[in-house]
From Swiss-Prot:
It catalyses: RNA(n) + a ribonucleoside 5'-triphosphate = RNA(n+1) + diphosphate. Pfam families: RNA_pol_Rpb2_1, RNA_pol_Rpb2_2, RNA_pol_Rpb2_3, RNA_pol_Rpb2_45, RNA_pol_Rpb2_6, RNA_pol_Rpb2_7. NCBIfam families: PRK00405.1, rpoB. The gene is rpoB. This is DNA-directed RNA polymerase subunit beta. PANTHER family: DNA-DIRECTED RNA POLYMERASE I SUBUNIT 2 (PTHR20856). Keywords: DNA-directed RNA polymerase, Nucleotidyltransferase, Transcription, Transferase. DNA-dependent RNA polymerase catalyzes the transcription of DNA into RNA using the four ribonucleoside triphosphates as substrates.
Length: 1368
């Protein structure tokens, strides 16, 4: 593709109208940042924040023994260097991990028996080994046991308080019942809910429910305090025979007056039985009325807020929370009570729920309430006040048992309007009281319920946090063991390492990385699938949802997903909606909420200030679309602007807009943003398109798309597939397997060497058996910029993602071969290897130490001819480059046989003639069926201390040679650059003393002027001995430079010596294994019938026929098309994007053809510049091309002759006008259709056909991997039926429906064969075999084994069933 030497990248013609305001953040930062925060590896212990690993240690330590006489305190932790680097871990099957050392302090105390005062007796500090912790590679993955794994981030419900209702489903009446739930990060859940009688209940950890007031009383509140907390109190004054109450203006709204209410001037403000209106309340306030009259009927039935007591006798007339009846009211009168307090409950704005719940609960004291809670949580345990108090305190108020986390506290404060500090991560009494108050408010019609699918209520747990939780689990297990050891042993004689056994911690970490649901085998099919896997968000996993329980709401797209989670990319099938992908610009904040960037808008003017907003922060803002038309000053052109507000689309005044999207592709994920014309595709097909791009196999020759979206470069750069330059510099040397770059002077780090060596990955195997191969795209002498791409990886071309090939397609039916989405292709594609891919299989052979003796890897295998062993070397391992077919031996191995009892004669013969060859059997590694290819590598792993065979020595020698070459190059480049520096210092100076060589010959005379020629005579190693006449500081510089050179050389040598030592050392093999050999085979897969192919728009199909080139339909100029697709696949699927892509691709190819014509006619470089400028219609490109030297312009033209690459970004793609314009410029009809001719007859087809360039991918569902046939093979032990599946070399299952079909045809004999001899009739099988051998063709079917199994099953149920033979 078109590229420039200056920056090694494709020149894409961009059609986007919206300037990029902000760079897309690094695509795998979600992984890297999370783990960096967790480890804090680069920071000194004093500078570490209380997060991640540090927080875990601080939360579990100090550990005290049961008698509080000694404690184990945490000081700090440090990480060592990993034993193997990433490459070695891949090869040896090791885990890439660093050792963790923790510095702990053991303090023992003397306790004074009388006063209880503690005095320190002894302090011991020690560093303890704490197992290993896996490290993350540069690309955001982990290497566990030699395979790359990804930890998927989990989307779970945020801790905090959630209010909800049951939508009327719980009770038969359909009444809406509200509930509240306090969810901590860890600890007991607390639920409050109403029942259909409006009583309030509480559940702790989903146990049986209690009246909520029991919990409130257990907090230490009395009934009276609770009533006064939740209800407002009115004071009633007894005035002779009548009553009046104090005016409380807040409570009057909506109430009725029981009698006329008069102002101070006697004017009637509210008539009897009329409501207090706002105007009336205002009048009351103005006339300063203190009391209003109340009728007796109004007071009867009200509730006393405190005990009403007769002061003279001390007798309680009306108890707190008791209704005042007529008789009680009379008694109050007669006893001369002057005033009393009642609760304000109007059954309109304030309901009697809590008061009625109090009537239900009989607890008198907090102790009773706590004992009741203890009974519910620990049924069967006899409760004591002490144990009940301890349990209650530990439920919600003990930081070790209960943790809301900072997020939970923030959410709680936000919802309930509290002011608690963020580090208060346990519940407080106020929290519980306020939750109840908010819930009662909901029942009374105030407040709103929460939407649990809102992204403000769901947060992301990334790697760091998931591992932090696991580490805490391991530490807590260890804590118990430490406490027991402290109390069992005498502490004075112990050191910290005697107490600590880090096994539980290592085991938990190992288990998490090895077998957690969120630790997944990385999808490494191509660079896009890697990136997508790392950006995935899963609602499944421990502490998350399960597929079965997840309803429709959780899976659905939510308005808050906009710009945070992609609405398109999710798997089809049972996981739909539960697994999502992060949007392109989204990031995760420190609290785990997903944020998206917006531009700030001030008074209708869009600024370039960018702020990230979480879903909660964005609430209420009116947010304009990224494509809203603006003038040059950044103001909205239209009076009314399309915007989003609170999850709705609205038309709104431009002055009210507060934020604006940064880019149209902010909405979608990386995979979806790679689909051009996504806006013209149906969502279901876009979903398939984004999922299928992840299954595209890397092809032999990558071909970047002619019609792209501009995201291709970013994906290739961030995925780690391509090699990215670490510093600015100049390319020193390049070959296929490495690039050496000399770093610019100013860029060298303190401890750096000044040289970057990039060893490229050559034909390595990925997790999915695809081929990983990197090839350089720079030349010697090229300048490289930091962050620039210097080598292409799998599926990348010129630093851009290239998953498929640009092919010429026609939409037309062709003799039925594209029926039902089949695809017809030209043989040309197969001939040119356009869709050929390389797959690498790894096969392993292990020699073990068995009971009968050692297995041996050798080429001396009994009973095999020369032909079978022709490709094995003397060590018994296949040579590299051998072409192998199924059944060929890759590694020769013999295993000792079990000794049989020998007869005396045999023993005698043995004694005379020695051992015979018959006591070993051939257990060689052979190539499995269906695999055919070339051996490209073999690795031998042998135990430490065992003799190395010739193959191992050869492999070691080549690896060491490679390392020594790297070492030599690094030292050479450093010496050259130092040489230059020193020469510039010395030339022009005068020498102070003469310098002689070993033979006494003068190299430099005293007082001689130093020149380059003179220096050339002096050996470089002796330059430091040159003394100068008048330059003391130059001498210092000279000495410093030489010393620095020596140090850097030493450093390089030490690093390489260490690497060489590792190669020579033996390998750590599993117990019982003597030697292990891995053989790698490269398989070339050409495109063949049955392979699955797809475009980027969800247009998938299976290859139905490969047609000779001359039979394909051809264009007027004789060009045959390469692929024929069915036009009926478009209308019903509604993915019109593929047609638009085809049109634009045609225009791109047409412009390329025009450039080729210029080349063919030998136009001058100047004319070439003009032509390229015309094609791009972009001033910046024109400037760039004008600045290029002539030869590079011609090189660029040759690149562009294949087609001018274009970018049509998502949601801001090419308009219809632009499309027609491009087609016409390229010399085609604006309809994009043309007459095609039948390749077989040469006649024109009747209708015009849409023809153009489409980007097609070959997917990882290859027919060679799936096709399978069984002759005889393994049988299941129990049923004696053949196994199923290709891996087991199984048969094809014949189910009920197939039997019905055979019955329908009346094919009785065939059916009997299917069900007996071909399946599980054991005796019949052997009889059949014998009959075939003898040449008799008769079927004698016996009894199927599965029938015997059925009889045995019945007999196990005590039903005696037996078969009786029919009597003749």
């Amino acid at each position: 593709m078109a590229y420039s030497v200056a920056n090694n990248q494709l020149l894409r013609k961009h059609f986007s109208t919206i300037k990029g305001i902000i760079e897309i953040p690094n695509l795998i930062d979600i992984q890297k940042n999370s783990y960096k925060r967790f480890l804090q590896a680069g920071l000194p212990p004093s500078a570490r924040k209380n997060i991640g690993l540090e927080a875990v240690f601080r939360s579990v330590f100090p550990i005290r023994d049961f008698s509080e006489t000694c404690s184990l305190d945490y000081v700090s932790y440090s990480l060592g260097t990993p034993k193997y680097d990433v490459g070695e871990c891949h090869q040896r099957g090791m885990t890439f991990a660093a050792p963790v050392k923790v510095c702990v302090r053991l303090v023992s105390w003397d306790v004074d028996k009388e006063s209880g005062v503690q005095a320190i007796r002894d302090i011991k500090e020690q560093e303890v080994y704490f197992g290993e912790i896996p490290l993350m590679t540069e690309n955001g993955t982990f290497i566990i046991n030699g395979t790359e794994r990804v930890i998927v981030s989990q989307l779970h419900r945020s801790p905090g308080v959630f209010f909800d209702h049951d939508k009327g489903k719980t009770h038969s009446s359909g009444k809406i019942l509200y509930n509240a739930r306090v969810i901590p990060y860890r600890g007991s859940w607390l639920d409050f809910d109403f029942d259909h009688k409006d009583l309030l209940y509480v559940r702790i950890d989903r146990r049986r429910k209690l009246p909520a007031t029991v919990l409130l009383k257990a907090l230490g509140y009395s009934a009276e305090e609770l009533l006064n907390y939740y209800y407002q109190v009115e004071t009633v004054t007894v005035d002779g025979d009548s009553f009046k109450k104090k005016v409380n203006l807040d409570l009057l709204a909506g109430q009725r007056a029981s009698t006329d209410v008069l102002g101070n001037d006697g004017e009637i403000i509210v008539k009897a039985n009329r409501k207090f209106t706002k105007a009336a309340i205002r009048k009351l306030a103005d006339s300063n009325v203190e009391y209003i009259p109340v009728s007796e009927e109004e007071i009867v039935g009200k509730v006393a807020s405190t005990d009403i007591v007769d002061v003279s006798t001390g007798e309680v007339i009306v108890e707190c929370n008791e209704e005042i009846s007529e008789s009680k009211l009379e008694e109050l009168r007669t006893r001369g009570i002057v005033e009393f307090n009642i609760l304000f409950i109007d059954h309109l704005h304030v309901g009697p729920y809590l008061r009625e719940t109090l009537l239900l609960d009989r607890m008198a004291t907090p102790e009773d309430a706590r004992i009741e809670i203890y009974r519910r949580l620990r049924p069967g345990d006899p409760p004591t006040i002490k144990s009940a108090n301890a349990l209650f305190e530990s439920l919600f108020f003990n930081p070790e048992r209960y943790d809301l986390s900072v997020v939970g506290r923030i959410k709680l404060n936000y919802k309930l309007g509290l002011q608690s500090p963020e580090d208060q991560t346990t519940l407080t009494k106020d929290d519980i009281l306020e939750v109840v108050r908010y819930l009662i408010g909901l029942r009374d019609g105030r407040g709103t319920i929460d939407d649990i699918d809102h992204l403000g209520n769901r947060r992301v747990r990334a790697v760091g946090e998931l591992l932090e939780n696991q580490y805490r689990v391991g530490l807590v297990r260890m804590e118990r063991a430490i406490k027991e050891r402290m109390s069992l042993q005498e502490v004075d004689s112990l050191m910290p390492h005697d107490l600590i056994n880090s096994k539980p911690v290592s085991a938990v970490v190992k288990e998490f990385f090895g077998s957690s649901q969120l630790s997944q085998f990385m999808d490494q099919t191509n660079p896009l699938s890697e990136i997508t896997h790392k950006r995935r968000l899963s609602a499944l996993g421990p502490g998350g949802l399960t597929r079965e329980r997840a309803g429709f709401e959780v899976r659905d797209v939510h308005p808050t997903h906009y710009g945070r989670v992609c609405p398109i990319e999710t798997p089809e099938g049972p996981n739909i909606g539960l697994i999502a992908s992060l949007s392109t610009y989204a990031r995760i904040n420190e609290h785990g909420f997903v944020e998206t960037p917006y531009r700030i808008v001030e008074q209708g003017k869009v600024t370039n200030e960018i702020r990230y907003f979480s879903a909660l922060e964005e609430g209420g803002h009116a947010i304009a679309q990224a494509n809203a038309p603006l003038d040059d000053d950044g103001r909205f052109l239209n009076e009314l602007v399309n915007a989003r507000q609170n999850g709705e689309f609205v038309l709104i005044q431009r002055e009210e807009i507060g934020l604006m999207d940064v880019s149209p592709k902010q909405l979608v994920s990386v995979a979806a943003s790679l689909i051009p014309f996504l806006e013209n595709d149906d969502a279901n097909r876009a979903l398939m398109g984004s999922n299928m791009q992840r299954q595209a196999v890397p092809l032999l020759r990558a071909d970047a798309p002619l019609v792209g979206t501009g995201m291709e470069r970013i994906v290739a750069h961030d995925s780690g597939a391509a090699v990215v330059a670490r510093h600015n510099g100049v390319v020193e040397s390049v070959d296929a397997s490495r690039i050496v770059v000399k770093i610019d002077e100013g860029e060298v780090d303190e401890d750096g060497t000044g040289v970057d060596i990039y060893n490229l990955i050559k034909f390595a195997r990925s997790n999915q058996n695809t081929c990983l191969n990197q090839k350089p795209i720079v030349k010697v002498g090229d300048r490289v910029a930091s962050g620039g791409i210097i080598a292409d990886g799998p599926s990348t071309e010129w630093g851009e993602l290239a998953l498929g090939q640009n092919v010429l397609v026609a939409f037309m039916p062709w003799e039925g071969y594209n029926f039902e989405d089949s695809i017809l292709i030209s043989e040309k594609l197969v001939k040119e290897d356009r869709y050929t891919s390389i797959h690498i299989e790894e096969l392993e052979c292990v020699a073990r130490d068995t009971k009968l003796g050692k297995e041996e890897i050798t080429n001396d295998i009994p009973n095999l001819g020369e032909d079978a062993l022709k490709d094995l070397d003397e060590s018994g391992i296949v040579r590299i480059g051998a072409e192998v077919k199924p059944g060929d031996i890759l590694v020769g191995k013999i295993t000792p046989k079990g000794e049989t009892q020998l007869s005396p004669e045999e023993k005698l013969l043995r004694a005379i003639f020695g051992e015979k060859a018959g006591d070993v059997r051939d257990t060689s590694l052979r190539l499995p069926p269906g695999v055919e290819g070339v051996v490209i590598g073999a690795r031998v792993f042998s135990r430490k201390g065992s003799d190395k065979d010739s193959r191992t020595e050869y492999i070691e020698k080549t690896e060491i040679e490679k390392l020594l070459k790297d070492q030599h190059d690094e030292i050479r480049i450093i010496r050259e650059s130092t040489h230059g520096k020193l020469e510039s210092l010395l030339v022009g100076q005068t020498s102070a003393s003469a310098l002689f060589d070993a033979a006494g010959k003068e190299l430099l005379g005293q007082g001689e002027k130093i020149t380059s020629e003179v220096l050339a005579e002096v050996p470089f190693a002796r330059w430091r001995e040159i003394s100068l006449l008048d330059a003391s500081e130059n001498e210092e510089k000279l000495s410093a430079i030489m010393t620095s050179l020596a140090q850097r050389e030493e450093l390089i040598k030490a690093v390489f010596a260490d690497k060489i030592e590792k190669i020579k050392r033996g390998d750590d093999l599993p117990p019982g294994v003597i030697k292990m050999v891995k053989v790698y085979i490269a398989i070339k897969r050409k495109l063949s019938v049955g392979d699955k192919m797809a475009g980027r728009h969800g247009n998938k199909g299976v290859l139905s026929r490969v047609l000779p080139e001359e039979d394909m339909p051809y264009m007027a100029d004789g060009t045959p098309v390469e692929i024929v697709l069915n036009p009926l696949g478009v209308p019903s699927r509604m993915n019109v994007g593929q047609i638009l892509e085809t049109h634009l691709g045609l225009a791109a190819r047409g412009l390329g053809v025009q450039i080729q014509e210029h080349l063919d006619r030998y136009y001058t470089p100047e004319a070439m510049r003009t032509k390229i400028g015309e094609c791009y219609e972009d001033d910046r490109v024109a400037e760039f091309v004008d600045a290029l030297p002539d030869d590079e312009v011609m090189q660029l033209a040759r690149q562009l002759s294949r087609g001018v690459p274009m970018a049509s970004p998502v949601f801001e793609g090419v308009t219809e006008e632009q499309m027609k314009n491009q087609m016409e410029r390229a010399g085609f009809a604006s309809s994009g259709q043309m007459t095609l001719y039948n390749g077989k007859t040469g006649e024109a087809f009747k209708e015009k056909v849409t023809v153009g360039i489409m980007y097609m991918l070959k997917l990882h569902h290859l027919v060679d991997d799936k096709i399978h046939a069984r002759s005889i093979g393994p049988y299941s032990l129990v049923t004696q039926q053949p196994l199923g599946g290709k891996a087991q070399f199984g048969g094809q299952r014949l189910g009920e429906m197939e039997v019905w079909a055979m019955e329908a045809y009346g094919a009785a004999h065939a059916l009997q064969e299917f069900l007996t001899v071909k399946s599980d009739d054991v005796t019949g099988r052997t009889r059949m075999y014998e009959a075939i051998v003898k040449g008799k063709h008769t079927l004698e079917a016996g009894l199927p084994e599965s029938f015997n199994v059925l009889i045995k099953e019945l007999q196990s149920l005590c039903l005696d069933v037996e078969l009786l033979e029919e009597q003749e």
